[in-house]
C-alpha cells in the first residue's frame, strides 16, 4: 500500500504534526495493473495551513510565512483529487523501485500551475525497522467517555494521567 497524507498550504504543518491531514491508501498491485487503486480515504480536520505572507506583511513583520485558519468549506472536502492521489502513488512506485526499498517522499502541489512535484525522498524508517520483529496486538477491554480526539502517533494502548503541554519550554 502507498500511504499519502495531504493538507492545504505549505507542508511544514503536516511534518510538525500541527495539523490532522487527509489520508489516502492506494493498493500497489491494482495501480501497477493500471486499475483504479484508491482503496481508502480519511478526511482530516485540516484546521490550519501555513501560507506565504504578502510583500507588505513581510516588510512589516520580517516573516516569510504565517499560519492561518482553513475555511470550514475547505476543511470539509479532501485536499487532493483521486487523480492527484493516484499520480503521487505512481511517482512513489517509480522512486521505490529505483531505490529498491520503501521511501518517505515529500511532495507539493504548486498553487499557481496545479502541478505535483516531488521535493525529496529518503529511506522510510518506521515501518521497515518493524520488519522481522514480533508483532504485539492490544485489545481494549472496555470503552470510556471520549475526552479528546486526534491523530494516533503510535500503535499501543496507554493509560495514566493526561498532561497538557502548552509550549516547547514545558
State where each predicted segment sits.
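Non-catalytic, soluble scaffold/interaction modules
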Residues: 1-170
